[in-house]
């Protein structure tokens, strides 16, 4: 049995982390899997496999220190792969990607497959140290991979057009979801008895919850707005809710490891994100038969929903456009029902069995 090294920063909460946890049970049937982490947080149930820690760092580590440590971690990673006899590396997230690619420069000969789950030119659009370093490292290192697996067409196009990556080195591997598990968890009860609109995501600027709240405030509706997630903007959003006199209508319920029970019971799902790689939450909302109002963000929104075929797209960072989208979904019962009826059909394209089959094809070369 071939040895597969899956290298990711941690298995804490996050989209790439959830994809790894979803694929692990199937990949473990075909490979002897070695999970290589840089942080000991594991938030998901995973099958029995060998776990190795390259280091135990903190996400809040100084960015300059992170950069300076890369070559030393690459040498350590090269030695670990050699000692374990790894045949193929499957690497997720930027920092592990850089380390594995530097290890390739230092002589690591194993087959190297990396995942790209963001749109780098959007993710690193600011003119600061972090963005400049990341763009430089992507341009320098990514061409050294044997195969790059962006999780959307938009992310693939970004690598080709903005980082001069050869399209011959790239194949799309969409995010995997566990439809059966989602369906089971969606059956759980919730304490909330009122009808509601739902949004799920970290409380940060990228998710743009403030715009969603302001757009919702203009609706004439008895529906609550429920937001699941934690983040640095919680106090700021609570202040906005108070300013708009919405304390009884907008509910910040924090993180819930089972958002599906809310998705299955909401009137519709609203998502105001400024950018995404390819959002797990949106796929999961479709798996729960949600009608969706979503910003036409880069990348993946239009790829997932089509031209309003599976969800209603609105302009990014445009309060009036979001308001009109919410209003349309609220008032057009026929449209809302039509989206609900075909949502799960769209979600089936991302079921773990299909995506794992694609992953195995790429990993086995």
From Swiss-Prot:
Superkingdom of the organism of origin: Bacteria
Keyword Cell inner membrane: yes
A Pfam family annotated for this UniProt entry: Glyco_transf_4
Disulfide bridges in this chain: none
Membrane topology annotation: Peripheral membrane protein
GO MF assignments: hexosyltransferase activity
Name of the protein in question: N-acetylgalactosamine-N,N'-diacetylbacillosaminyl-diphospho-undecaprenol 4-alpha-N-acetylgalactosaminyltransferase
InterPro entries found in the cross-reference section: Glyco_trans_1 (IPR001296), Glyco_trans_4-like_N (IPR028098)
Any one annotated GO CC term: plasma membrane
Subcellular location: Cell inner membrane
Organism: Campylobacter jejuni subsp. jejuni serotype O:2 (strain ATCC 700819 / NCTC 11168)
Main location: membrane
Pathway, per record: Protein modification; protein glycosylation
Primary gene name: pglJ
Keywords: Cell inner membrane, Cell membrane, Glycosyltransferase, Membrane, Transferase
UniProt-listed Enzyme Commission number(s): 2.4.1.291
Catalyses which reaction(s): N-acetyl-alpha-D-galactosaminyl-(1->3)-N,N'-diacetyl-alpha-D-bacillosaminyl-tri-trans,hepta-cis-undecaprenyl diphosphate + UDP-N-acetyl-alpha-D-galactosamine = N-acetyl-alpha-D-galactosaminyl-(1->4)-N-acetyl-alpha-D-galactosaminyl-(1->3)-N,N'-diacetyl-alpha-D-bacillosaminyl-tri-trans,heptacis-undecaprenyl diphosphate + UDP + H(+)
One GO biological process term: protein N-linked glycosylation via asparagine
Function in brief: Adds a GalNAc residue on to the Und-PP-Bac2,4diNAc-GalNAc disaccharide in the N-linked protein glycosylation pathway. Transfers the third sugar in the heptasaccharide biosynthesis.
CDD domains per the UniProt record, alphabetical: GT4_GT28_WabH-like
Family stated for the protein in its record: Belongs to the glycosyltransferase group 1 family.
Other notes: N-linked protein glycosylation in C.jejuni consists in the transfer of a heptasaccharide (GalNAc-alpha1,4-GalNAc-alpha1,4-(Glcbeta1,3)-GalNAc-alpha1,4-GalNAc-alpha1,4-GalNAc-alpha1,3-bacillosamine) from a membrane-anchored undecaprenylpyrophosphate (Und-PP)-linked donor to the Asn side chain of proteins at the Asn-X-Ser/Thr motif.
């Amino acid at each position: 049995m071939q040895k597969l090294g899956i290298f990711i920063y941690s298995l804490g909460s996050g989209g790439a982390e959830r994809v790894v946890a979803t694929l692990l049970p199937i990949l473990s049937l075909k490979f002897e899997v070695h999970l290589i982490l840089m942080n000991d947080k594991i938030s998901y149930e995973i099958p029995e496999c060998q776990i190795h820690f390259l280091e135990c760092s903190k996400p809040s580590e100084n960015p300059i220190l992170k950069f300076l440590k890369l070559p030393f971690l690459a040498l350590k990673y090269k030695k670990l792969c050699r000692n374990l006899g790894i045949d193929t590396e499957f690497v997720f997230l930027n920092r592990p990607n850089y380390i594995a690619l530097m290890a390739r420069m230092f002589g690591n000969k194993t087959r190297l497959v990396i995942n790209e789950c963001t749109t780098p030119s959007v993710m690193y659009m600011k003119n600061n140290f972090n963005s400049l370093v990341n763009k430089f490292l992507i341009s320098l290192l990514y061409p050294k991979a044997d195969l790059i697996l962006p999780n959307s067409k938009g992310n693939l196009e970004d690598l080709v057009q903005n980082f001069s990556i050869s399209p011959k080195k790239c194949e799309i591997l969409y995010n995997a979801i566990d439809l059966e598990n989602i369906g089971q968890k969606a059956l759980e009860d919730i304490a909330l008895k009122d009808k509601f609109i739902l949004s799920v995501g970290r409380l940060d600027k990228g998710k743009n919850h403030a715009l969603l709240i302001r757009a919702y405030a203009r609706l004439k509706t008895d529906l609550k707005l429920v937001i699941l997630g934690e983040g640095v903007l919680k106090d700021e959003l609570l202040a906005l809710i108070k300013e708009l006199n919405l304390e009884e209508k907008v509910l910040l319920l924090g993180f819930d490891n089972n958002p599906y029970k809310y998705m299955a019971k909401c009137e519709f799902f609203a998502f105001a994100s400024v950018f995404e790689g390819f959002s797990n939450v949106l796929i999961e909302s479709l798996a729960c038969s949600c009608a969706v109002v979503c910003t036409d963000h880069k990348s993946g929104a239009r790829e997932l929903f089509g031209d309003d075929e599976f969800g209603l797209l609105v302009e990014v960072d445009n309060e009036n456009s979001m308001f009109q989208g919410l209003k349309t979904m609220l008032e057009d019962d026929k449209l809302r029902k039509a989206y609900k009826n075909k949502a799960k059909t769209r979600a089936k394209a991302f079921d773990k069995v299909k995506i794992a089959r694609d992953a195995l094809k790429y990993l086995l070369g």
